[in-house]
């Protein structure tokens, strides 16, 4: 969702491109390390989850962010720990900051911007978006959608940014945002045995059916939400569950279901 909104913001002229430095969007956070030291971290690094910051365990850092009371400031004050843009490492931080970029560039919070653009065009009205006390939206995983509305997002990507004959997001953004950009960092949270790389907040995955490789663009949500887009099959798959608090490996059960049950039935 966050990736689509960034694309719409860029298409609308609110953003100059993915090479813009992140620190330029947050002048009100002067005093934080990213701002004062002008870290060479760009929007592209956030989109590919490769800012190379010292965030530690992904789950623990997300919990620390929620306790901090300043979600944006929490991430902007972390140390740089490597070279940005080399490997993807799943974390809530880049997504939260991209939500802040949307707010800075458009003057609207992510849900407000979505309501005027993406949600309006796709007729999405039943949703809930978690937010902090200061209004910051939880663009790292705080959005609740119906399965039907999530499927609409997949269909939008499958149709290269078109919805019912209307251009919602540019085909160039869709193509760039779903292609493989980076490998995953060793031991990174969220990657599955089916994962081949990371795009702009999308997982690139391969499934094997009757010795045929089927490529997919995948998004996952905490608790067992799965969105799979299969361009060669012209198909979108959505699975919902509520396995809150389960080991992250349980997420991969859905990949097995897709490979062993759903995809064979579609071929």
What is the role of each PLM region?
Residues 219-267:
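Structured C-terminal helix/loop/strand segments within mature extracytoplasmic catalytic/sensor domains
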Residues 94-101, 141-162, 225-242:
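Active-site-proximal alpha-helical segments within enzyme catalytic domains
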Residues 124-127, 178-236:
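Active-site Gly/Thr loop motif
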